[in-house]
Each structure stands twice: as C-alpha cells, then as structure tokens.
Amino acid sequence: MRSFWLLACLLLSLSAGAAQRVVSLAPSLTDSVLELGAARRLVGVLDGGERPAAIGDLPSVGRYGQVNLERLLELQPDLILVWPGSVPEAQLQRLRDFGIALFIAEPHSLDELALQLAALGEALGEAEAGQRLSARFREGMRRLAERYRRDKPLKVFYQVWDRP
C-alpha cells in the first residue's frame, strides 16, 4: 500500500506534463523505459552491464553505488528513475534537496511491479504503453502459474540477493 501512495504522489507531482529529460539510475528501469517506447526522453544512465544499442551514446552518470552528481545535474533532468540500492541515501537526499522529481522503484510483490510499470508509463507520457506493458507482464505471470500449477513445488531456493 505504501508503494501505491508513493506512485500516486509521483503522478501528482508530474501532473503538469510528462517528464521530458529523464536520467535512469538502474539498468532495469532503463530497460523498462525502452520497452515503453520512451528512449527519446532518456538523457543519461547509470552504467551497469551491457548497454542496449538504443542508448549506446547516452552519457553515463556513474555506476552502481557511485553517482556523479555534478554530471547528473549538468544533464538537467526533470525526472530521475531510482532503484533504492543503486544510490547511497545521502546522494538520494541531495537529489531531493535539488527538487528534482524522483521515481523510486521499490516493488515488494509482482502485483506492485505491474503497477510500477503502469505508473512509469504515466510519468513518461506513455500511459497506454504502460498499461499494455503491465497487462503483458500480468498475463505472462498468469501463464506461468497455469503452466506449473500441477507441478510439485521445488524444495530448493537459490537467493541471488537478500534485498531484491
């Protein structure tokens, strides 16, 4: 529920219009922007892994855990996409102090992830694309549940990270 209110507050703050200059501080959020057809709005990204060709020439604002605030501010973003672990809290607070809108992606469930995709589409002026991407994600999850509904649950759990 907390995430819902955070998304609602973000959308209210962006109600004057869709973000035009976006910096993504998480490769997963960059991928979502591309899926939404909003690559033209990206002006900077955080380095992390292989870059999709669509953003190959975009300036880097740092890497995981080390954001170059001066470089980021030079890009004059009106929206910054953040995965909480990708930016130290002190830097996150400085971004808030500058008054730049933040889209903080912190889903705690698959349903919240679907809501996040729709909210991101709205924030980027791609509301219909956001709804379609959210619906496609939900449908994919439904198909997986249907496909494996009769299988015995696995007795093994492999955790990649303790704070996904």
Predicted regions and their residues:
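Generic signal for short, ordered secondary-structure residues
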Residues: 12, 40, 51-52, 74-75, ...
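Extracytoplasmic substrate-binding proteins
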Residues: 18-21, 89-164
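Intrinsically disordered, low-complexity boundary segments flanking structured domains
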Residues: 11, 32, 46-48, 142-147
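Pocket-edge positions in alpha/beta enzyme catalytic cores
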Residues: 7, 61-64, 105
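Bacterial N-terminal signal peptides
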Residues: 4-13
